[in-house]
A protein has these predicted regions:
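Carbohydrate-associated surface elements
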Residues: 60
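N-terminal glycine/serine-rich phosphate-binding loop of ATP-dependent small-molecule kinases
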Residues: 1-54, 65, 81, 109, ...
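Gly/Ser-rich phosphate-binding catalytic loop and adjacent alpha/beta segment
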Residues: 63, 72, 85-89
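Short, charged, surface-exposed secondary-structure boundary motifs
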Residues: 65-69, 140-142
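FAD-binding glycine-rich core of flavoenzymes that anchor FAD
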Residues: 26, 73-78
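Gly/Ser/Thr-rich active-site cleft segment
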Residues: 45, 79-171
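Residue-level structural signal for beta-strand termini and adjacent loop
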Residues: 56-57, 134
Length: 171
């Protein structure tokens, strides 16, 4: 595929190794765990929960020209008013826009969008959801409505079906 990707499988294997060591040392005293990472990077999943096209990094070069493309679809002032997120090259919104502009078929088949900590939490728990604070970094979340920024999502031409439940931290 080209581009910059995270080796998410290796990261997850390291998490499992760490959990095994913690279990050996602390046993039943561990009652919960959480997944917290950087924001912006995401993975698209199919209906069976399989990754589509890898886990791209925010440094991926495919976003060249996407700020201008986004501006042509919705003024950045309007995006900021809706999301509270300043325009930046690493915004998830631009990367997802690039998926559509470059006709990535993964966007059409995607059943779910999960950000990095949400993907790890899904692999640990089997629950697909988007945690509110990391979702807020995507430039696709409306903090006033406490919901996806549908106006932005629609302006970018992104399929609504892949935007799932948003949950509070610690759930």
């Amino acid at each position: 595929h080209g581009g910059c990707y995270w080796n998410t499988i290796s990261l997850f294997e390291s998490i499992l190794e760490g959990l095994q060591k913690a279990n050996e040392k602390y046993g039943d005293t561990i009652v919960s765990i959480g997944a917290d990472t950087w924001g912006c990077d995401y993975t698209l999943l199919d209906k069976q929960g399989n990754m589509l096209g890898g886990h791209r990094q925010y440094r991926d070069p495919r976003i060249e020209g996407m700020q201008e493309e986004m501006e042509s679809r919705m003024p950045m002032e309007s995006v900021f008013a809706c999301t509270g997120v300043q325009p930046a090259f690493y915004n998830s919104s631009l990367h997802l826009l690039a998926e559509g502009v470059k006709n990535n078929p993964c966007l059409d088949i995607a059943d779910r969008l999960l950000f990095t900590p949400d993907l790890l939490a899904y692999w640990l728990s089997g629950v697909q959801s988007n945690e509110r604070t990391v979702t807020s970094t995507s430039q696709l979340y409306d903090p006033i409505k406490r919901d996806w920024a549908w106006e932005v999502i629609d302006a970018l031409g992104l399929p609504r079906k892949m935007f799932g439940d948003i949950v509070s931290s610690g759930t």
